[in-house]
Amino acid sequence: MSKWKAKIFDISSIGIADVLSSGIASIFWLYIATTIGPEKYGEITYLLSIATLASGLSLLGSNYTLMIYSAKKIQIQSTLFLLTSIVGFVAALTVFFFFVDIGLSLIILGYIILALVTSDLLGRKLYKTYSKYVILQKILMVVFGIGFYYILKEPGILLGISLSYFPLIKELIKRFKENKIDFKLLVEKKNFIFNNFALNILGTAYSSLDKLIIAPLLGFVILGNYSLALQFFTLMSILPTVIQKYIIPQEATGNDNLKLKKIIILISVGIAVLGSTLGSIAISYIIPKFETSEEIIRVVSWAIIPVTINGVYYYPKFWAKEMNRHIVFSTTTTVSIQILGIVTLGSMFGIFGIAISLVIAISGGVCYSFIADKYLQKYS
C-alpha cells in the first residue's frame, strides 16, 4: 500500500467513526432540543457542563499523555487509569452530594472512561477499534437517552447518556492486564504530565465555563440557543478534529504531514463560508423554536479557521516535541479572552457579543501559537 493510500485508509477509519458519531449525536440533540424547548435544553446543557468540568479535572491530563506515550510505546496506561479512576469516583460522589442526580454523577465517570480508552486506542493507532467503540457509544446514547426520557422525563436523558459509556470498561480492564502499575513513570514524566494536566483544566474551562457563566448572566433560553449553535459548530469541526487525531500520533513518531495540514486549513475556509451562509439559515428552518441560534452560527462559523490552524498545525508539533506548555499558554489566552468577552460583550450586546467573543478568543490563542512556533524555530 502506498504512503498516501495508507494515510487515507487510516484517516478514513477515524473519519467515518467521527462523522457517524457526530451525526448521530447531532440528530439526538436536535430531537431533544425540539422536544423539550430552549429553556429545558439550556438546563440540560448547564448540568452537562458541570459534568464536563468535573471529568476534565479528574482526568489529570491523562488523555493527552496517553495519546503521546501509547504512540511511543511507553507502558503508562495502567498507572494513569488507576489514578484517574480514583479521582473520578471522588468527583462523581462530590457532584452527587450537591445535585442528588445519579445520571449526572455517572456521566462524569462515563466521560472519563471514553477519554482514557479512545486516547489510548488512537495512540496505539488502533483506528478500527476506536471507530467501533465511538459509534457504539453514540448509538447507545440515542437508545438509552430517548428511552429513559420517556420514562423519567429530563432526568432520564442524563441517566441514559451515562449508561452508553460503560461498554468501554472492557478496554480499561484489558490494559490493566497488559501493563503493570508503575508510579515511577509518573515521577520521570512529571513535567510533561503536569503540563497536560494544566492543558486539560484549561480545555475543560474552555468547553464548560462559558455555559456556566451564560446561564446566570443571560438565562437558560439564551444558553439553550447558544448550545444548539455550538452543536452545529461541532459538526463543522469534524474534519479538523479527525485530522488532529490522526496527526498527533504520527507527529510523535516523526511524520510531519505538512502537505496534508495545508490542505485541511484551506478546506476550513470553505467550511466557514458555508456555515456562515447556508448553515445559519438551515438551523432556523429546521428548528424554528431556536431562531436566535441563526445569529450565533453566522458569527461562530468563522472560528473554524483558527480552530483548524491550531488543531492540525501548531498543537501536534508542540505535543510531539513535548513542549506542551505552549498549548497550555495558547489555551490560557483563549479561555481568558472568552471569559472576559462573555462578561463584557455579552452584557453589552447579548447573544451577538457572546458569539463574537468566541471567535476573538480562539484567534487570540492562534496568535500565541504562531509566536511560540517562531520562537522555537529560532532557538531550537
Feature locations, PLM:
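Membrane-water interface segments that mark the loop-to-transmembrane alpha-helix transition
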Residues: 9-21, 46-100, 253-276, 330
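Alpha-helical transmembrane segments and their helix-entry boundary regions
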Residues: 14, 41, 77-80, 104, ...
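Interhelical loop/hinge segments that connect adjacent transmembrane helices in multipass membrane
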Residues: 1-3, 7, 102-106, 124, ...
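Membrane-interface helix-capping segments at transmembrane helix termini in multi-pass transporters
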Residues: 35-47, 72-84, 88-111, 150-158, ...
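Helix-loop interface residues and adjacent transmembrane-helix termini in multi-pass membrane transporters
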Residues: 35-38, 124, 151, 217-220, ...
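Interfacial/gating helices of multi-pass transporter permease domains
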Residues: 27-53, 192, 196, 212-234, ...
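Short runs within selected transmembrane alpha-helices of multi-pass transporters and secretion channels
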Residues: 21-25, 29, 47-67, 104-122, ...
